[in-house]
C-alpha cells in the first residue's frame, strides 16, 4: 500500500470517527501510551488519573477509553450512568493484578489499625478492598494524613518504597507488584539516555 493510499484511508477513517462521535455523543480519551494515530483523533490525551477526572466532568454519553482495562473500570466507577467502551478489552496492565485479596485480609488480621492504600493503577476488584486510592502525585500526602500507623501499600513496590522513605513515622508495608516494562530498565540505560 502506498503512503498516499494509507493517508487517504486514514483521513477517511478519521472523518467517519468524527461523524460517529457527534451522532453518538461520544468522547475519546487516550492514554499517553497508545499509538500516535489514536492520540491524534482523541478528544483528550493524558495519564490515567487525568483522564478519569476529565471523564467525570464530560457531557458525553459514551466514553471511549483508549488505554488498559483498569482505566476503563475507573471511568465506569466514576460514571455509572455513562457507557464506557474499551476498544481493546485485552489491553491490560500486569501490575494491576499483582496484589492478592487474601493477603490484604491476612494483613488486616495481623495489624488491626492497618490502612490499605491502593495505587490507582489497579483493578476495580482490588480497589474495593482498599481504604483509599492514591496517585503517584498525591501518595505521600495521603499516607501522611492517615491516622493509621500501619500502612499496606499495594500493588506498586517502587512507589510504595518511595512513600515509605518519605513517611518514616509510619510503618509502610510494601506490596511486591511492579511494572514489568519499567522493571527491565537499568541504571546504565538511564545514564545513556541523559
Please provide the spans of the model-predicted regions:
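Active-site loop-to-helix "anion-binding N-cap" substructures in soluble metabolic enzymes
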Residues: 2-194
